[in-house]
């Protein structure tokens, strides 16, 4: 258990990133960690979109007025979405999945930072772009 204690003590939000791309193995590890997250009644109401397209990361960095600009410099983002009709605790379920991604990132030696955009007016436009854009990578797990 000492390793886990070290992991949670050492994890910090990072807002400065290198342009080094993640390997497919690293991305798969992050997504597997998210899929292992507990959810209410095992509803698994979340969905994950991996974004590594620089233009899309730039657009996403403007999805809220303040606090997301650093996303433009990241090599990749995982967009965590949840269906409010699938679970009455969808916010909590998505939050738990998000922290699982962050803990896995820390374990892999990767920096991460949570950006909360729920309720931001520009989010719907960004999400529509994500869903219909071909530049997102999907990994079968």
Describe the predicted segments one by one.
Residues 1-27, 138-141:
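Specificity-determining recognition surfaces
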Residues 7, 63, 126:
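Residues that form generic nucleotide/phosphate-binding pockets
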Residues 11-15, 57, 101:
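Short, cationic motifs built from Arg/Lys/His that form the positively charged side of catalytic pockets
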Residues 25-32, 36-97:
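Glycine/small-residue-rich phosphate/adenosyl-binding loop
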Residues 34-35, 78, 86-127:
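Small-aliphatic-rich amphipathic alpha-helix that forms the alpha element of a beta-alpha
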Residues 47, 118, 140:
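Residue-level "edge-of-site" marker
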Residues 69-73, 77, 127-141:
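A glycine-rich helix N-cap at a beta->alpha junction
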